[in-house]
Amino acid sequence: MRWVALSAVVAALVSISSFGFATVFQVQPGVFDPDGTGIVTAQWIGRQGLPDDVGKANQALFLQKDGPTSANASAFAVIGGVEGLTITELGFDYKNDGHCGAGAPRFNVTLPDGRYFFFGCIYGKPQAPPASGWTRIRWNDSEGTVFPAGNYEWPGFGEFGVVVQSIAIVFDEGTDVGGGSVLLDNININGSLIGKPTVRTP
């Protein structure tokens, strides 16, 4: 039930943040906290991420759930600009002192027919690390494991990719199963690395 309510929030934000520009990706942090617990945080933080190609902001996406996993609260970030996009690869870098669990942080990917799928952090395929103290993970047609939210199967990226309706990063595992927070950088959509709130692709 928690994801059903959160998915409605994500859908609303996708319609706001995509603007119909296929060449612009936006990562919009938010929190789902209907009970007012105050334990979830989602924000971009400067000087905490990996070095940027341009500028010195070096931002990272901070997601936190400072309480039990059972609490009806989630930190998330909606990826704008993906509605109707054919995706062939997903991934991100995470700082090693943060939490990487089966369910958080994760990509929630919704297809146009309403089916949605979970890409949990520990099920991504580790790559060569981008820097000391960081881990890079990927999902594509040959790497990573994807789990369906219902009685259906992930269609696979395939040779030509899969069309999506929305993508969000969700963090809803609390301090009872890990550290309760993570720093993410270089969010990967089809090879485009997003390390700040808005990125224009080539």
Residue locations for each model-derived region?
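Extracellular carbohydrate-recognition regions
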Residues: 21-46, 195-202
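Short carbohydrate-recognition loop motifs
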Residues: 47-74
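Short, flexible beta-strand-to-coil junctions
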Residues: 65-69, 111-114, 170-177
